[in-house]
Amino acid sequence: MEMFLMENNNTSFFHQPIRVVSPLSLVLILFTTLFFMSHGEKANAIDLSVISNQTGLMFKLAYIPLTQGAVASSKATKKAQDLIFRDLVESGYFDVSIPSNEAVSKLQAISLTGEGTSMLASGGYEGVAAARVTEDGTGTHVLGVVRDPVSGKVLLSREYTTSGAARHAIHRFVDDVIFQFTGLKGIAMAKIAFIGKNPRRGYDLYAMDFDGEGLHRLTFDHVLAYSPAWSLKTHQIAYVSYLHMDPQILVYDLRTGRRTALARFPGLNITPDFSRDGIHLAVALSKGNRSQRTEIYVTTLKDKTFNRLTFSRSNNLSPSWSPSGNQIAFVSDRDGHPQIFVMDSDGTNVHRITYNGFYNVSPAWGPSGDLVAFVCMNDRHRPKICLTTPDGSRSIQITHGRGQDDSPDWSPDGRSIIYSHQVRGKSVIMKMFLDGSHTHRIGTFPRDVITPMWAIP
């Protein structure tokens, strides 16, 4: 959840994608009164063909769901085969299809490592993936193979075993298929944290797999919470909680389930963000009562010494680290309205990068370093997701249509973005490729969700 404070007759206004009320009865509202108007020199649009080239790397892949004996009638095995197909499609790297029934029947009758895939070469396939899923008393076993349809050469042959959910073995196989074709790490094993509304009252911290499965509730506080920041290197999630009435930054340890307070100064302690190395966190603190402005600080989990980076007479919040750790994007109203700025990680070389409109917040720096996602206000005064280059020279709006879009965050491979989407009071997590294609909901969480965040690998 992007929060933005502006002093106006001693009242603080917050941008918030859904209606909630804190224990202290703070008024939380959207900046719907801010118009999306031209302000200063407009940036040039980002070339969509460039974005498409980033996300449009496609390989034509045949998938063969291999069966063996009674396994063919297993509902669990059929579900596992469907998940493999879905994971391959979801990756965005493959144009996946299951060949004709005749071809499948012939290929199912041969050994995984035998000859026979050449019958698919005429179909223009660049690879043939096959998997056999079996279950026994020790767990689920996935034997996955990828072959060249022309030469018949085995490109990948590996068995994946798990004593837990079958999807874990399947996700590992799909990530290996992606690496075999692209040389890039897949995201099938990636995790997403978010804040979810509880059935009766309040919110809590949740985590799930990249596809919305494997949902886990991590906290049971029933209080307002938001802005999770997840570092896999430290196995920790930093987030904002009103557990002790005031907004404090807590750190949840995924290994132990324990929480510690990172920042609990008087006033606001909000919007944490981990650096890629998992060592540093950038946060926004007011260090006083709620009428005080927030400033950006950097700290570490080890010594908890807070180094102040911003010193302007304005609100500064929502820091987002660059992949290199050398720069930080953040929100400031120093020019009168909330805009995105970038500074070096020591607080120097501050410069503004958004100029279109009066409302640009919630920056999220992409893992490749060449794009920053953020929330902009469209011409119908609805928050939408936009992209800009780090120097502000090019920008584009990538979500459209009804509803309000908020809290963008990047997949670890930089090919897609998740965000919260609200229509008619209902907020869900959506995912899309950068070119706007393959937009769909993630998960089936039955209540409102806010501030989704990918785990930083």
What positions do the PLM features span?
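C-terminal/domain-edge helix-coil "capping" segments
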Residues: 43-59, 150-219
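Amphipathic beta-strand/beta-sheet edge segments enriched in Tyr/Trp
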Residues: 47, 109-176
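Short, solvent-exposed, polar/charged sequence segments at loop or secondary-structure edges
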Residues: 67, 72-85, 89-140
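Multi-bladed beta-propeller domains
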Residues: 104, 209-226, 253-270, 299-317, ...
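A flexible loop/linker signature enriched in serine peptidases of the S9 family
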Residues: 185, 196-204, 222, 240-249, ...
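Residue-level detector of Asp-centered blade-edge/turn motifs that repeat once per structural unit
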Residues: 187-188, 232-233, 276-277, 323-324, ...
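Hydrophobic beta-strand positions that form the internal "hydrophobic ladder"
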Residues: 192, 237-238, 278-281, 325-329, ...
